[in-house]
Amino acid sequence: MAIKIDRIDAGSEAEALGLQPGDELLSVDENELNDTLDYDFYTDSSSFHLKAKVADGIREWDVRRTERGPFGCDFSTYLGDQKHSCSNHCMFCFIDQLPPGMRESLYFKDDDERLSFLFGNYITMTNMQDHEIDRIIKMHISPINISVHTTNPQLRVRMLANKRGGEVLKYLPRLVEGGIAVNCQLVLCRGINDGEELRRTLGDLLELTPMVQSIAAVPCGVTDYRQNLFKQTPYDAETSAAVIDIMEEFGDECKRRHGKRIIYPSDEWYLKAGRPIPPAEFYEDFDQLENGVGMMRLFEDEFRAELDRPHRIYGTKQIDVVTGTMAGPLITELMEELHHQYPMIDVKVHVVKNNFFGGNVGVAGLVTATDIIAQCEGKLESGTLGIPAVMLREEKDTFLDDVTVAQLAQRMGVKVEVLPTSGGEEAKALLRSGLHISRRRKGGTT
């Protein structure tokens, strides 16, 4: 295995050795380099033996370093091989429920422990072996994000449709004993792993604290594309409230015993149950934002905090913004408050129902351009449309349905502004000049 160099940092020790972009690093101290985790770990030393494939063959160096830290090689990919694909057939898998016509990359299911550390992906551990656990502990790759779902081995085999689903639960205590911090995700399926099974899971995971540093529960997503899949019944207000009660009960007990809650229901449970989102203190360090835990609380608090700061506004501004059905009431309330404090700013909120996936999906991050066009075309009141960044891929240029921001702007006949995910930054974006402004000048208006 090898990792190919994409760029050499100027003035670095790698440059001093004569390494070039395109060279391939093979090993450090005879340790094969499979990915950038290996590279970072083995080159963070005062001396090492480096082997690389260069333009004229294989070269080796005995490296003596003046100081530890980055060696100076950058890579276009973090992995020397392919991503580890998922070997499960989970009863709740959202990717299996995707409609056709979306971005091609969305149909790939990864289950790679390296991506867990590098990018926060959640893994089930079913394609991991003992030597990979040993490597994580040796290199102290921490934290690791694990999709647990249940600690009942037989039930986990059933839920993941993988015979190793229960067996690999033994890796959890090994990781914890090895000093690896773990964030846990529980995707709950109504009548399957909630109720008493949820109590069992939370009780088992609490035995692994404090190295299990957070546990989040999210409801199984249900789209209209579940043909030939396990029948899932969406959670309603009553069953969502029951999940909240169990999670909060165990969270309260954990806080009494360990001084920290660590157990959090995602925002969606509270919205489904018709209960208010808890205050910021409930979420402590906001360890599970990517699972939608405390995201609405943080957004609201940051937005209001920014509104409380003084802002000098010139002229008038008008903008339309879109959001999903879950966040719709909160975003509408915040925009009304913005207009109340700054009457010269008028924000029209368009709550977009997710017909693309089906009526049970309400998060803003899964809204597509297709639904925005279908529901908002001809209804905009300004020349600017604000799109939350969570609706787009990381490069902020393409929706889930493979429609680009430029294509949406052309179809709608407006300028499209990508709004930040942070509540404070979104408030700043709406308050700053340059969205759609009319300024009064002496002798007339423009």
Give the residues covered by each predicted segment.
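Flexible, glycine/charged-enriched surface loops at secondary-structure junctions
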Residues: 22, 212, 254-264, 345, ...
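Flexible glycine/acidic-rich beta-alpha junction loops that bind and position SAM and/or redox cofactors
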Residues: 192, 212-238, 258-281, 354-360, ...
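Conserved Radical SAM active-site core
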Residues: 58, 65-211, 221-250
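PDZ/PDZ-like groove recognition
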Residues: 1-9
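Structural preference for beta-strand elements that scaffold enzyme active sites
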Residues: 143-145, 181-183, 214-216, 262-264, ...
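Radical SAM enzyme core and accessory elements
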Residues: 4, 274-446
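PDZ domains, with a preference for the canonical peptide-binding region formed by the helix
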Residues: 27-51
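Conserved PDZ fold ligand-binding element
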Residues: 14-34
